[in-house]
Amino acid sequence: MNRKLIQNLAETLCRQVKHFNKTETECLIRLFNSLLGEQAERKTTIGVDRAKFRNILHHTFGMTDDMMTDRVCRVIDKDNDGYLSVKEWVEALSVFLRGTLDEKMKYCFEVYDLNGDGYISREEMFQMLKDSLIRQPTEEDPDEGIKDIVEIALKKMDYDHDGRVSYADFEKTVMDENLLLEAFGNCLPDAKSVLAFEQQAFQKHEHCKE
């Protein structure tokens, strides 16, 4: 993709996606093209496949849980075609790198709402938490500890007592206690990963400086 095309695309995207100026958006497009490799030169570019993006989530942003990275990919791949378009890529990084608390809450809730019905149910909490607890083989019911944690989470988050967590419940919980933003699994990069990525993407490239 030549410089003029990148500039035009950056101009369009930075009007549609928050938090990045035109120069930064250009950098992210170049990075996207480098991930595409030879495909970037073709007229019909599909995008970055989920396997490659999962690799970035794992190695660049420290998200190591398979179930979570799969959910993150599904949420970010909005048209569900199995590939990340350049717009989906920039939108994801907008939330990851510079998202407001409100944007991050909406994103995390979507990741945790496994079946997309607008609620986080007991079953969904169990699914997300079951791999995070070390089970003792001697326990009669190895799932008992996870069930206990689910009940504690519901007690803390389910403000309207309907046995599930709505977005309003989740928002109120996180506003009261920010640390509970990623209560059911790591789906955002930590501050160190964000800083390292920004330095790599924006500061080390001359063409990405204003």
Swiss-Prot record:
<comment type="function">
    <text>Regulates ciliary motility and is required for cilia-driven determination of body laterality.</text>
</comment>
<dbReference type="GO" id="GO:0009966">
    <property type="term" value="P:regulation of signal transduction"/>
</dbReference>
<dbReference type="GO" id="GO:0005856">
    <property type="term" value="C:cytoskeleton"/>
</dbReference>
<dbReference type="Pfam" id="PF13202">
    <property type="entry name" value="EF-hand_5"/>
</dbReference>
<feature type="binding site">
    <location>
        <position position="119"/>
    </location>
    <ligand>
        <name>Ca(2+) 2</name>
    </ligand>
</feature>
<keyword id="KW-0963">Cytoplasm</keyword>
<keyword id="KW-0966">Cell projection</keyword>
<feature type="domain" description="EF-hand 3">
    <location>
        <begin position="145"/>
        <end position="180"/>
    </location>
</feature>
<feature type="binding site">
    <location>
        <position position="124"/>
    </location>
    <ligand>
        <name>Ca(2+) 2</name>
    </ligand>
</feature>
<keyword id="KW-0282">Flagellum</keyword>
<dbReference type="GO" id="GO:0005509">
    <property type="term" value="F:calcium ion binding"/>
</dbReference>
<feature type="binding site">
    <location>
        <position position="160"/>
    </location>
    <ligand>
        <name>Ca(2+) 3</name>
    </ligand>
</feature>
<keyword id="KW-0206">Cytoskeleton</keyword>
<feature type="binding site">
    <location>
        <position position="158"/>
    </location>
    <ligand>
        <name>Ca(2+) 3</name>
    </ligand>
</feature>
<keyword id="KW-0677">Repeat</keyword>
<dbReference type="InterPro" id="IPR018247">
    <property type="entry name" value="EF_Hand_1_Ca_BS"/>
</dbReference>
<dbReference type="GO" id="GO:0005737">
    <property type="term" value="C:cytoplasm"/>
</dbReference>
<feature type="binding site">
    <location>
        <position position="83"/>
    </location>
    <ligand>
        <name>Ca(2+) 1</name>
    </ligand>
</feature>
<keyword id="KW-0106">Calcium</keyword>
<feature type="binding site">
    <location>
        <position position="77"/>
    </location>
    <ligand>
        <name>Ca(2+) 1</name>
    </ligand>
</feature>
<feature type="binding site">
    <location>
        <position position="113"/>
    </location>
    <ligand>
        <name>Ca(2+) 2</name>
    </ligand>
</feature>
<dbReference type="InterPro" id="IPR028846">
    <property type="entry name" value="Recoverin"/>
</dbReference>
<dbReference type="InterPro" id="IPR002048">
    <property type="entry name" value="EF_hand_dom"/>
</dbReference>
<keyword id="KW-0969">Cilium</keyword>
<feature type="domain" description="EF-hand 2">
    <location>
        <begin position="100"/>
        <end position="135"/>
    </location>
</feature>
<dbReference type="GO" id="GO:0005929">
    <property type="term" value="C:cilium"/>
</dbReference>
<keyword id="KW-0479">Metal-binding</keyword>
<feature type="binding site">
    <location>
        <position position="79"/>
    </location>
    <ligand>
        <name>Ca(2+) 1</name>
    </ligand>
</feature>
<feature type="binding site">
    <location>
        <position position="169"/>
    </location>
    <ligand>
        <name>Ca(2+) 3</name>
    </ligand>
</feature>
<feature type="binding site">
    <location>
        <position position="81"/>
    </location>
    <ligand>
        <name>Ca(2+) 1</name>
    </ligand>
</feature>
<comment type="function">
    <text>Component of the outer dynein arm-docking complex (ODA-DC) that mediates outer dynein arms (ODA) binding onto the doublet microtubule. Seems to regulate the assembly of both ODAs and their axonemal docking complex onto ciliary microtubules. Regulates ciliary and flagellar motility and is required for cilia-driven determination of body laterality.</text>
</comment>
<feature type="binding site">
    <location>
        <position position="88"/>
    </location>
    <ligand>
        <name>Ca(2+) 1</name>
    </ligand>
</feature>
<dbReference type="GO" id="GO:0036126">
    <property type="term" value="C:sperm flagellum"/>
</dbReference>
<feature type="binding site">
    <location>
        <position position="117"/>
    </location>
    <ligand>
        <name>Ca(2+) 2</name>
    </ligand>
</feature>
<dbReference type="GO" id="GO:0036158">
    <property type="term" value="P:outer dynein arm assembly"/>
</dbReference>
<dbReference type="InterPro" id="IPR011992">
    <property type="entry name" value="EF-hand-dom_pair"/>
</dbReference>
<dbReference type="GO" id="GO:0003341">
    <property type="term" value="P:cilium movement"/>
</dbReference>
<feature type="binding site">
    <location>
        <position position="164"/>
    </location>
    <ligand>
        <name>Ca(2+) 3</name>
    </ligand>
</feature>
<comment type="subunit">
    <text>Component of the outer dynein arm-docking complex along with ODAD1, ODAD2, ODAD3 and ODAD4.</text>
</comment>
<feature type="binding site">
    <location>
        <position position="115"/>
    </location>
    <ligand>
        <name>Ca(2+) 2</name>
    </ligand>
</feature>
<feature type="binding site">
    <location>
        <position position="162"/>
    </location>
    <ligand>
        <name>Ca(2+) 3</name>
    </ligand>
</feature>
<dbReference type="Pfam" id="PF13499">
    <property type="entry name" value="EF-hand_7"/>
</dbReference>
